[in-house]
Design a protein with these regions (language model features):
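A conserved regulatory-domain signal marking ACT and ACT-like small-molecule sensing domains
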Residues: 1-163
Length: 163
């Protein structure tokens, strides 16, 4: 029973890293909803599993749509990028960042603790680890970092929270 209470009282209970991933970003002008819907249809047809999705729309009709996916889908993503470029679309640009990893921190204590994300970001800053993407929920925070820094990121976050 004492072990259960100790886990419950901790802010974080685990920190782990993903296999290699990449972030794919589409940036464009015009009817973003239509284009993003077409991108999602294409991803479904290609059976590409996506994660950490982010969409932004701006007042001047510009938009961006980003997601992460496994590096095993690199060839399919490159095919999609070539299709967009072959259309010579000046309204949509595709950017791909490779060689990344998601480092995720989990804990039920995160729901009631304050400054968790702040502490995670500061721990990574102390180690000079560049962060590409951050997502949070009540019980998890995920940061995307260069894969060569993923183990260092796990150690930095684990040390910060005594996991």
């Amino acid at each position: 029973m004492e072990q259960i209470l100790n886990i419950k009282d901790k802010v974080l209970s685990s920190v782990n890293m993903s296999p290699e991933i990449m972030i794919v970003s589409f940036r464009g002008e015009g009817n973003g909803q239509y284009i993003i819907s077409s991108i999602l249809d294409w991803l479904r047809e290609e059976e590409i599993t996506i994660d950490m999705v982010m969409q932004e729309s701006y007042e001047d009709e510009k938009w961006s749509f980003s997601f992460s996916c496994g590096s095993e889908d690199k060839e399919k993503i490159e095919k999609g990028r070539m299709i967009v470029e072959a259309q010579k679309s000046e309204t949509v640009k595709v950017y791909v960042q490779e060689g990344l990893s998601d480092v995720s921190a989990y804990g039920v204590g995160m729901a009631t603790a304050s400054r968790v994300v702040d502490r995670i970001l500061k721990a990574l800053k102390r180690e000079s680890i560049k962060i590409y993407h951050v997502t949070t929920s009540e019980i998890s925070t995920t940061v995307t970092v260069d894969i060569e820094n993923a183990i260092r990121a796990v150690i930095a976050i684990s040390t910060e929270f005594d996991v």
